[in-house]
Amino acid sequence: KHFLDSLLFASQPEVAGKMVDVGAGAGFPGIVTKIFKPELELTLMEPTGKRVEFLKYACAQLGLTGVEFAKERAEEAARKAWREQFDLASARAVAALPMLAEYCLPLVKVGGSFLAMKGASGEEELAAARGAIRKLGGEYKETRTLHLPGGDTRTLILCKKISQTP
């Protein structure tokens, strides 16, 4: 399931350029996306040292190049050199959308995208996140509903970064 989720994500047209996977965990969707799109410049952002070591090992074993590893909490990284550096920010299974927007949008440069991977609750979370998205310089664009084999539904919520995060 995680692999299929990641492939559906990787096939989206916004997945290009310089991407950050916030809360990279075991590498979904980041590593799978990098395999699918080797030209992607990928940063795997994960605060847990053991997970970062695993991600480094996995990428080395897979022969992946063009991957950076950031042992950072997203909310702290957004105040540092990572702020507004990415064409795309995404996260899977990290937080509810209002908090996820606060983690991801400050990392995206103006003109870039925030693409949130959510389950069936995506639309409900979007209603609660609209104000935060606007305050952070984002604009909601669309919700994409995807269907996995076996009947599971996934929701991708696309926001564009239209102004700098205050």
Model-predicted regions and their roles:
Residues 5-8, 24, 54:
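Hydrophobic side chains within alpha-helical segments
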